[in-house]
C-alpha cells in the first residue's frame, strides 16, 4: 500500500513503462517560469518522479 504522510493513497490509470510516451504536463521553475514537457521536444529527457 502506498501512503503519503501516513495516509493511504489510491492511484488510478495505468502505470507507465520504460519507453512509453509521457503525457504533456507543466511545472513552475524556481524563477517562477512555467515549463512544460513540450518545451523540451526533440531533446532527450530523464524524468525522475518521487
Swiss-Prot record:
Q: Which UniProt keywords apply?
A: Antioxidant, Oxidoreductase, Peroxidase, Redox-active center
Reading the lineage from the top rank, the first entry is Bacteria
EC id: 1.11.1.24
SUPFAM superfamilies documented for this protein: Thioredoxin-like (SSF52833)
Q: Which reaction does it catalyse?
A: a hydroperoxide + [thioredoxin]-dithiol = an alcohol + [thioredoxin]-disulfide + H2O
InterPro entries this protein is in? Answer: Thioredoxin-like_sf (IPR036249), Tpx_Peroxidase_subfamily (IPR050455)
One of the record's GO molecular function terms: thioredoxin-dependent peroxiredoxin activity
Q: Note whether Oxidoreductase occurs among the keywords.
A: yes
Has UniProt tagged this entry with the keyword Oxidoreductase?
yes
What Gene3D superfamilies would the database entry show?
Glutaredoxin
The protein's job, in short, is: Thiol-specific peroxidase that catalyzes the reduction of hydrogen peroxide and organic hydroperoxides to water and alcohols, respectively. Plays a role in cell protection against oxidative stress by detoxifying peroxides.
> Subunit structure of this entry?
Homodimer.
| Matching PANTHER family | THIOL PEROXIDASE
Query: What is stated as this protein's family in its record?
Result: Belongs to the peroxiredoxin family. Tpx subfamily.
Q: What is this protein called?
A: Thiol peroxidase
Upper lineage is:
Bacteria, Bacillati, Bacillota, Bacilli, Lactobacillales
Amino acid at each position: 500500500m502506498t501512503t503519503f504522510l501516513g495516509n493511504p493513497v489510491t492511484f488510478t490509470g495505468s502505470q507507465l513503462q520504460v519507453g512509453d510516451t509521457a503525457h504533456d504536463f507543466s511545472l513552475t521553475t524556481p524563477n517562477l517560469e512555467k515549463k512544460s514537457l513540450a518545451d523540451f521536444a526533440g531533446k532527450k529527457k530523464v524524468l525522475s518522479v518521487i
